[in-house]
Curated annotation (Swiss-Prot):
Quaternary data: Heteromultimer composed of HisG and HisZ subunits.
Name of the protein in its database record: ATP phosphoribosyltransferase
Reaction catalysed by this enzyme: 1-(5-phospho-beta-D-ribosyl)-ATP + diphosphate = 5-phospho-alpha-D-ribose 1-diphosphate + ATP
Keywords: Amino-acid biosynthesis, ATP-binding, Cytoplasm, Glycosyltransferase, Histidine biosynthesis, Nucleotide-binding, Transferase
PANTHER family cross-referenced by the UniProt entry: ATP PHOSPHORIBOSYLTRANSFERASE (PTHR21403:SF8), ATP PHOSPHORIBOSYLTRANSFERASE ATP-PRTASE (PTHR21403)
Keyword 4Fe-4S (UniProt): no
Organism placement in taxonomy: Bacteria, Pseudomonadati, Pseudomonadota, Gammaproteobacteria, Chromatiales
Amino acid sequence: MVEPLKLALSKGRIFQEILPLLAIAGIYPRDDPKTSRKLVLDTNQADLKLVIIRAADVPTYVEYGAADFGVAGKDVLLEHPGNGLYEPLDLRIACCRMMVAGEPEVTPRSGRLRIATKYVHSTRRFYAERGEQVEVIKLYGSMELAPLVGLADRIVDLVDTGNTLRANGLAPLEHITDISSRLVVNKASMKMRHQRIKKFICLMAEAVEKQHG
């Protein structure tokens, strides 16, 4: 019996937006993802299972072969240090922008800026490319609070509508990069199961085109 391929997904916005795309490709989970507590879901395709994990863990599961492929935000991939992944397809879902944000009327302190963010590597890279030295403070949430209480001069975070920034008296100041979710593939799986994985990539590429017309 052929071992099913495993597609790693994270719950939340990406999961909500990938399900319609999978449906266009003719792929449906057998259990209701909204109510099921299973972390491995069967689909109507006997050779494909969905593996539900944390968003930040998707690249690791794929790189080490625990999943053959996965869906991860570009923000997560930019922070992932490994190189065992192919990134063959932009799925054009969960789109937003990675931005520098802060209090628009406040002049930052002289000397080295303090930047609070979850995206340490992306932040350091952005400022290094401009020849600026900054102090990066890693946080795991509530980024908007950091400038308000004096922890940081600026934050780097993902911005969709900007409503949360505005509600806290902040504004986007500089654009770092556009973010969307990508299909990532384990390099070894791509070689060993090339035909099956290539077929899935083509199905998803067609689904993306149909969804965006």
